[in-house]
């Protein structure tokens, strides 16, 4: 189905469905843990592809690995299995564009980013925005940071 216009503030292609998670519990904490691991796996897989000299087209999961994506929110539907649907932004790469380019580690990091031995993830550019939550919630518990 199509998303209502009010949810298209990031892009026309701003949401994706994760594969069915048989082991995910109904609680958001477990879904959050699974989602982080899934994204990390995809991110590492992409880096390996680029390091080998091959190019990789952009899919939804690789888009959220970009440093420009600062917000991600997920909902889930629990029936026989847990289905997870996520919305992310702001919009990063577009379909068909490269995500990573080869080069020296940290050589192309934007201004005001951390990269190197003093950072949590050595070799990855990280924006210093500690006030942004890793995952945000929309209307599940009465507290929301969605607009």
UniProtKB/Swiss-Prot annotation:
Expressed by the venom gland. GO terms for cellular component: extracellular region. InterPro entries: CAP_sf. Gene3D superfamilies: CAP. It comes from the Eukaryota. Keywords: Allergen, Secreted. SUPFAM superfamilies: PR-1-like (SSF55797). It is found in: Secreted. Belongs to the CRISP family. This is CRISP-1. It comes from Phoneutria keyserlingi. The lineage of its organism: Eukaryota, Metazoa, Ecdysozoa, Arthropoda, Chelicerata.
């Amino acid at each position: 189905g199509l998303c209502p216009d009010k949810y298209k503030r990031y892009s026309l292609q701003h949401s994706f469905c994760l594969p069915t998670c048989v082991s995910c519990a109904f609680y958001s904490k477990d879904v959050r843990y699974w989602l982080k691991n899934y994204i990390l796996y995809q991110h590492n897989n992409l880096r390996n592809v680029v390091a080998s000299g091959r190019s990789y087209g952009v899919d939804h999961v690789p888009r959220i690995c970009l440093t420009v994506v600062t917000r991600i929110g997920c909902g889930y539907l629990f029936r026989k299995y847990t289905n997870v649907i996520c919305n992310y932004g702001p919009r990063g790469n577009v379909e068909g564009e490269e995500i990573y380019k080869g080069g020296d580690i940290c050589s192309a990091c934007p201004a005001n980013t951390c990269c190197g031995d003093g950072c949590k993830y050595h070799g990855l550019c990280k924006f210093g925005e500690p006030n942004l939550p890793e995952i945000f919630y929309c209307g599940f518990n009465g507290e929301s940071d969605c607009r």
